[in-house]
Design a protein with these regions (language model features):
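N-terminal module-boundary/linker segments of secreted carbohydrate-active enzymes
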Residues: 34-111, 275-281
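Domain-level detector of nuclease and nuclease-like folds
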Residues: 120-281
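Intrinsic-disorder/low-complexity peptide segments enriched for small residues
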Residues: 22-25, 66, 236
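Polar low-complexity intrinsically disordered regions enriched in Ser/Thr and small residues
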Residues: 11, 32, 65-68, 180-183, ...
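A broad, structure-centric signal for solvent-exposed, well-ordered loop/edge residues
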Residues: 8, 115, 276-277
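Short, His- and charge-rich active-site/binding loops that engage polyanionic ligands
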Residues: 104-107, 111-125
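Secretory targeting and sorting signals
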Residues: 6-44
C-alpha cells in the first residue's frame, strides 16, 4: 500500500507485515482488507512544465477557458488506441503494477497490493472500476468511454460495489473495511491519498468526451445524484481535491505507461494540474 509523507509525497506501497498493517474484516470475516493510517496532503497547484509542452501540448500552451478545453480535447482524442473491455484487464496489470512487486497491482480505494491473478467478481478479488461511473451517460462497457484506461482502475470488488454509480463529494460514513473512504446516499469520498487522482480522472473524461465521434457529451457539474445523465459531480469538491493532492510518482508513471504502451494519449491534468483552474473557474 502507498503512504504519504508530511510533504505530500506518496511513498511506495508497503506490503503486509504484522506490525505495519491493521487488518479489518469485511463481510463478517469473509474478506480482509489491509490498511494503514495515512496523513492527508495539502499543496497549492502551481504552473508546471513537461517535456511534452513543445510537442504534444504545443497547441494548448498559452490558452485558457474553453479554447484550452477544446484544444486539449483535440490533442487527447487524436491517434488514440481504443481497447475492448476484455483488453482492459491486461492493461490495468501494466498501468497499476505495484512498483515493489511486479506480480501485483495497487487497488485504488484501499491502496492495497493484490495479485494480478486475483481479478474477478468475488468479494475478496479486484475488478475494473469506472471512476466516471458508466451509468452517467449510459455508455456501459462500449469501446471508448467504457474502456478508457485513464479512468479505469483496479478496485476491491466490495468497495467498488459500495461506491456504485455515486457522484463524488465530501462527507458520509466511513466505508467498512476501507478506512479513509466515506459514503452516503448520493456520494462517495475516496481516501485522501487518491482524491486528486480521482478528480483528474473525472476531469479528463469531461474533456475527452464532448459529444463527437458517437460518444456522449460528458460534463462535470456541481451536483450529486446525477443519475443516468451524462454528468458527474461535485465540481467544486473535485477542484479542491486536485489542489490538495497533486500528482505523485505513481500517478505520473501511470500516465506515461498509458501514453507509451496502451492508448497513446495523456491525461493533461496530471501533466498540468493548474489547467483545471484555467478551464473551470
Amino acid at each position: 500500500m502507498e503512504q504519504r509523507s508530511q510533504r505530500g509525497e506518496r511513498r511506495p506501497p508497503v506490503h503486509v507485515t504484522p506490525h505495519r498493517w491493521k487488518a479489518l474484516a469485511l463481510l463478517a470475516g469473509v474478506t480482509t482488507i489491509a490498511v494503514t493510517v495515512q496523513t492527508p496532503a495539502t499543496a497549492e497547484v502551481t504552473a508546471t512544465s513537461t517535456p511534452y509542452d513543445d510537442t504534444y501540448y504545443k497547441d494548448a500552451i498559452g490558452k485558457t477557458g474553453d479554447p484550452l478545453k477544446n484544444a486539449l480535447h483535440t490533442i487527447i482524442s487524436t491517434d488514440v488506441t481504443k481497447l475492448s473491455y476484455d483488453e482492459v484487464w491486461d492493461a490495468l496489470k501494466k498501468t497499476d503494477e505495484d512498483p515493489d512487486n511486479s506480480a501485483n497491482v495497487i487497488l485504488l480505494y484501499t491502496g492495497t497490493s493484490q495479485s494480478k491473478d486475483a481479478g474477478g467478481s468475488g468479494p475478496d478479488q479486484w475488478n475494473r472500476e469506472h471512476v466516471w461511473a458508466k451509468s452517467h451517460g449510459d455508455f456501459g462497457t462500449a469501446t471508448g468511454p467504457g474502456t478508457d484506461v485513464h479512468h479505469l482502475r483496479p478496485a476491491n470488488v466490495t468497495v467498488n460495489s459500495i461506491r456504485g454509480n455515486k457522484d463524488f463529494d465530501a462527507g458520509g460514513s466511513e466505508v467498512e473495511g476501507a478506512p479513509g473512504n466515506r459514503t452516503d446516499d448520493d456520494s462517495f469520498e475516496p481516501r485522501d491519498e487518491v482524491k486528486g487522482d480521482v478528480a483528474r480522472m473525472v476531469l479528463y473524461m469531461s474533456v475527452r468526451y464532448q459529444g463527437d465521434d458517437d460518444f456522449p457529451d460528458l460534463e462535470v457539474n456541481d451536483k450529486t445524484d446525477n443519475g443516468s445523465q451524462p454528468n458527474l459531480g461535485r465540481l467544486s469538491v473535485l477542484k479542491k481535491w486536485n489542489d490538495e493532492d497533486p500528482p505523485d510518482a505513481f500517478e505520473k508513471h501511470r500516465n506515461d505507461v498509458i501514453f507509451d504502451t496502451v492508448q497513446h494519449n495523456r491525461n493533461p491534468f496530471i501533466d498540468h494540474p493548474e489547467w483545471v483552474g484555467e478551464i473551470w473557474k
